[in-house]
């Protein structure tokens, strides 16, 4: 029990150090397959009005199929507050192809884009063929002619893929609507669940459940495996689980603290935290040879490692300066540099893929905000105005 409390304090960013707050955390981990719930996120508009887009119900005899697809596309495109979706009741026409689309009809609604399409059934395979189109009203041109072939069971996935193409065509940025979220639930006393779901909270699946705490889940780079910490055997153990087979393996660990596993970008290593030498330090685990290398050695608490995109550096949290701050260590030279200097609490850092920026939790006036910082530059930028923000991670499209 004492060890569990120590580890919980460690993993959750030193929130019990120099504090008397009790904080509830929600950790969400993202992975893209190219491949909650009940959490409502309210996003307000910025200073610029978002593009207005109409999603016309696709032409098909079975309206339930049509509305399943178009409603899902509408929900996806409105998920981040980047678009204003026009209500179906405000539509002035219901085109299904470029041949029956008239741009002047839509200019009266002050609309930027229209999505329309039609569905047919492939009789020999019973698969749906979805032809969909994206029209730019301002420029008066057809931006996208897309075709999706889908079974009835995969219509939702197809709608996510269509949303990705539409989103990228408009913004120039890859869509992330096929992304999966991984998170831990504690629905009742002595019950913990490690779950994944679609980015909108649908299709929830429990990967592992236990009467003992589960912590620190992380995706492998290829999305085929996950790592996490479980207390199921009375001690903190790091497990790797294969998502297709469900097979679980416990890594060779010492008694004491074993926490915060994170995958390297090539999938060959896990960085993690262990107290095997008497104090929590960062270690590297070679998944092929099972060799363990010590990365940091300090009397302070080192935790929450994160790999840079090139795999040559680790970002980690340490209180070696007296308060939780972010540090960077070269895996080649073992040289350690302090990264953050603003305030007395900066933790849970993650690199952006460009290697030039990091995102992390910053405390200001006893409030916790998601912030970003450019490496090598002074200062930071707070992204959120709420008070108990935790566990940031970068989206698969780096946006």
Where are these regions (language model features)?
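Residue-level detector of Asp-centered blade-edge/turn motifs that repeat once per structural unit
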Residues: 176-177, 221-222, 265-266, 309-310, ...
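Hydrophobic beta-strand positions that form the internal "hydrophobic ladder"
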Residues: 181, 226, 267-270, 311-315, ...
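Amphipathic beta-strand/beta-sheet edge segments enriched in Tyr/Trp
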Residues: 39-40, 98-165
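A short beta-strand motif characteristic of beta-propeller blades
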Residues: 203-208, 247-252, 291-296, 335-340, ...
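Short beta-strand->alpha-helix linker/helix-N-cap micro-motif
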Residues: 42-104, 115-118
């Amino acid at each position: 029990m004492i060890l569990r409390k120590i580890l919980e304090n460690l993993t959750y960013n030193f929130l019990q150090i120099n504090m008397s707050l009790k904080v509830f955390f929600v950790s969400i981990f993202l992975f893209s397959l190219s491949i909650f719930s009940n959490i409502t996120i309210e996003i307000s508009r910025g200073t610029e009005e978002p593009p207005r887009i109409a999603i016309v119900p696709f032409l098909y005899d079975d309206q339930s199929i049509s509305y399943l697809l178009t409603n899902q596309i509408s929900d996806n495109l409105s998920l981040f507050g980047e678009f204003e979706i026009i209500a179906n009741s405000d539509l002035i026409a219901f085109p299904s192809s470029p041949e029956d689309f008239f741009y002047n009809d839509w200019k009266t609604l002050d609309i930027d884009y229209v999505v329309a399409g039609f569905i047919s059934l492939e009789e020999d395979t019973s698969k749906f063929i979805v032809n969909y189109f994206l029209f730019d009203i301002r420029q008066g041109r057809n931006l996208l002619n897309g075709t999706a072939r889908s079974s009835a069971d995969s219509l939702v996935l197809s709608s996510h893929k269509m949303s990705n193409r539409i989103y990228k065509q408009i913004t120039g940025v890859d869509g992330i609507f096929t992304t999966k979220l991984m998170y831990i639930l504690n629905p009742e006393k002595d019950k913990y669940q490690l779950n994944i779901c679609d980015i909108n909270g649908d299709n929830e699946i429990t990967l592992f459940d236990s009467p003992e705490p589960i912590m620190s889940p992380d995706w492998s780079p290829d999305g085929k495996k996950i790592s996490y910490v479980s207390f199921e055997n009375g001690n903190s153990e790091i497990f790797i689980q294969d998502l297709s087979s469900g097979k679980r393996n416990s890594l060779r660990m010492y008694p004491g603290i074993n926490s915060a596993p994170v995958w390297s970008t090539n999938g060959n290593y896990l960085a993690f935290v262990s107290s095997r030498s008497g104090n929590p330090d960062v270690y590297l685990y070679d998944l092929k040879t099972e060799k363990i290398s010590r990365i940091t050695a300090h009397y302070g608490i080192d935790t929450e490692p994160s790999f840079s995109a090139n795999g040559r550096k680790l970002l980690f949290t340490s209180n070696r300066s007296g308060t939780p701050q972010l540090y960077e260590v070269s895996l080649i030279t073992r040289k350690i540099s302090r990264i953050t200097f603003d305030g007395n609490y900066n933790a849970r850092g993650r690199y952006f893929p460009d290697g030039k920026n990091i995102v992390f939790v910053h405390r200001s006036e006893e409030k916790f905000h998601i912030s970003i910082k450019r490496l090598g530059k002074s200062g930071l930028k707070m992204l959120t105005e709420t008070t108990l923000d935790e566990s940031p991670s970068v989206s698969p499209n780096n946006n």
